[in-house]
């Protein structure tokens, strides 16, 4: 089981920031990534629908034989983390999410105790970050939904006048509130870090959950004795196998590949079309087990 891939799921391309951190910190592990690009963004959708879509993808990943799940989507984590853990961990598949790792880093980074959190409407309305920060009541939390950010990233627009205008509209109130640490509460948002940092100013620390989440993945694999050995498994011919990565999109694979190559590099040689889209509900048609 330790040679099985780590399953990583996001509503689109944003979770690739987490996948990149996992590849960097766990270079001997295999990754199987699914981006639900056919139904992105999740943020404006009802929580029940986000839960339904998320569990559908996670069920497919578990059926494909992944050894652990990473919910690399704040909206999904906020909507169904407890459901996912109840559904899969009893069968030996641990679940890692992205909210508490970001909270941990932000609490350590702040100097004045004023922390901003930006995310999708679904994430912000869920109050998941308020709940996660409840253990540190001395911190002052300022949250703000930034619904246009995900669509900008999914459209490949990560700089330029439209991005800067949206950043000012969403972030000026947080800057004026004096936050010194800003949690990027959506895994798409690091792709807009240039504009976000420009608007917030040099004195504000931007916190992405990617690196902390990758550390949690490592800790989880160690705790469950699932860490892949550095020299890999032996095949029938006695040779050691290298890690194998596969990235799937439920929408247009070509568009996904273009965006993915911007920050994953050579790991994305191909993106397979994971599903046949029929209206709003895709049906998995390609086996998720495989190589890149």
UniProtKB/Swiss-Prot annotation:
It is an enzyme of class 5 (isomerase). Its EC number is 5.1.1.3. Keywords: Cell shape, Cell wall biogenesis/degradation, Isomerase, Peptidoglycan synthesis. One of its GO terms (biological process) is cell wall organization. Substrate binds at residues 10-11, 42-43, 74-75, 187-188. The active site is at 73 (proton donor/acceptor), 186 (proton donor/acceptor). It catalyses: L-glutamate = D-glutamate. GO terms for molecular function: glutamate racemase activity. Pathway: Cell wall biogenesis; peptidoglycan biosynthesis. Provides the (R)-glutamate required for cell wall biosynthesis. NCBIfam families: glut_race (TIGR00067). Belongs to the aspartate/glutamate racemases family. This is Glutamate racemase. It comes from Beutenbergia cavernae (strain ATCC BAA-8 / DSM 12333 / CCUG 43141 / JCM 11478 / NBRC 16432 / NCIMB 13614 / HKI 0122). The lineage of its organism: Bacteria, Bacillati, Actinomycetota, Actinomycetes, Micrococcales. The gene is murI.
